[in-house]
């Protein structure tokens, strides 16, 4: 016979590993959403600070090598 059937008793379940045991609590929180705004204001502050950082970097970049001979007000 070309195909061979495997008995259900010979199949093993999922293996348990140390890493899996450590990560299981994180996976059990999947799909749960904290009520209210949560950490949204903190994320807004972080985004604002990052935007300021990017604008400072852009200012430094624009006034450096590329525009050496150009006077800007």
UniProtKB/Swiss-Prot annotation:
Q: Does the keyword Phosphoprotein apply?
A: yes
Annotated GO biological process? photosynthesis; protein stabilization
Q: Enumerate the UniProt keywords alphabetically.
A: Chloroplast, Membrane, Phosphoprotein, Photosynthesis, Photosystem II, Plastid, Thylakoid, Transmembrane, Transmembrane helix
Identify the species of origin.
Answer: Pelargonium hortorum (Common geranium)
Q: Which residues carry this modification: Phosphothreonine?
A: 3
- Source organism's superkingdom? Eukaryota
Which protein are we looking at? Photosystem II reaction center protein H
| MF annotations from Gene Ontology | phosphate ion binding
Q: In its keyword annotation, does this UniProt entry include Kinase? A: no
What HAMAP family would the database entry show?
A: PSII_PsbH (MF_00752)
User: What is one term from the GO cellular component aspect held by the record?
Assistant: chloroplast thylakoid membrane
């Amino acid at each position: 016979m070309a195909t061979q059937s495997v008995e259900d008793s010979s199949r093993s379940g999922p293996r348990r590993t140390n890493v899996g045991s450590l990560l299981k609590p994180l996976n059990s929180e999947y799909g749960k959403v904290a009520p209210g705004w949560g950490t949204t204001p903190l994320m807004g502050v972080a985004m604002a600070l990052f935007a300021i950082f990017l604008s400072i970097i852009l200012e430094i970049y624009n006034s450096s090598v590329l525009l050496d001979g150009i006077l800007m007000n």
